[in-house]
Amino acid sequence: DWSDPRTSNGDDINGGMSKKYYEYNKMVWANQVSYKISIARDHHIDALVGYEIDDQYRDYLSGYATNFATHDKNQISNGMKTESVGGNDTRTRMVSYLTRLNYDYKNKYYLGGSFRTDGSSRFQRDNRWGSFWSISGAWRIIEEEFMSPTKDWLTDLKIRASYGVNGTLPSDYFGYMGLSSLTNGYLEQPGIIQSQLRNDDLQWETNYNLNLGLDFALWNRINAVSYTHLRAHE
């Protein structure tokens, strides 16, 4: 941003230029293998295993200079007084191993399960990995023989439930580290201060989720879903 010395925004500082640069790169490498099989036409199995890498890089640079010799040479390097220069760069990575298995019998009874292990650079080595899982089941009641009299108007009816554990990353990229910062202290003398205490106990936030649902359809035209979600944190 340019504060022109010929205007009220820049006349008292003889012109000012502020520059900011931000770069963000994200690389995701995902590999999955799935397998489906039907046994005796009534048993259906769907399996999956996978491996993922998430690599994110952020680079930030800023500068502000004032006192320019002429208004038409306003590159920040032409400012005679450097008011501020700052910048930082961060890189975070996460590696994940995952698997999933689903089974159903005659499209009537459903069972499922999943498991994954995630390792993140946002934690110190001993707490880097977290393991999470879920199980699920469903019953398509409309496929039962005793539901035959209702099929003229009730064309689908299914109840389902799932329970599982997932993890949440901390918002800080280096929250577990003890950090120090450079600063201009008394009489603008340089110094070092502690900006963050070391936290070896920082771990994955664990969330326990229970989901209950009821799906039904009327006359093959009206579809409805009733859903309940309960969550607990640790």
Region spans (language model):
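Extracellular/periplasmic, surface-exposed regions of secreted and cell-surface proteins
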Residues: D1, D11-L230
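Short, flexible, mixed-charge acidic loops at enzyme active sites
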Residues: W2-R6
